[in-house]
Amino acid sequence: NRDLMVENGNLYVLKNAGIISQIPMDTTYEESEAYEGVPFVQMILHGTVEYTGPYLNLSENMDKTMLHLIDYGALPAFCWTNSDYTPKDVEKSVLYYDNWTSKSLDVYESFNSVFSDLRNARMTDRRKLQEGLYRTEYNNETYVYVNYTDSDISYNNMTIKAGSYLRVN
């Protein structure tokens, strides 16, 4: 029975976790030509236990965070409150549930329609193909290309739109 949700869980609790919240999507080291982050934890967990990345409504750049979620096979997540108050600053307004109902529903439905069949698939590879273009491979012969750049990229007779992704089966 895996009904437990954990945040940044450790190995000891994984056997009981149904979902892990807030898995880091970046590295603590500065990336360079000599060092680039690898989604090692995500590659081990994907298809075994579900996980989320950073809360989308708390992200500085929601579009880039969504691309990271797609690239790393993570589910979208939001952090809200339903307190009855008038937000006094931006941070509190991004936490207020009513401000996000429509947007979050769109995000969840979009992710579910495109990626629901990958939730149980194993992530078998993820590599940088060129600057700003990454490919994640799954054991069901699915490839997800993510373009982090501001320009469309042509690769192997495909075009991956700027700031977008392309799923290929």
Where are the predicted features?
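Active-site-proximal substrate-binding groove within the catalytic cores of carbohydrate-active enzymes
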Residues: 1-169
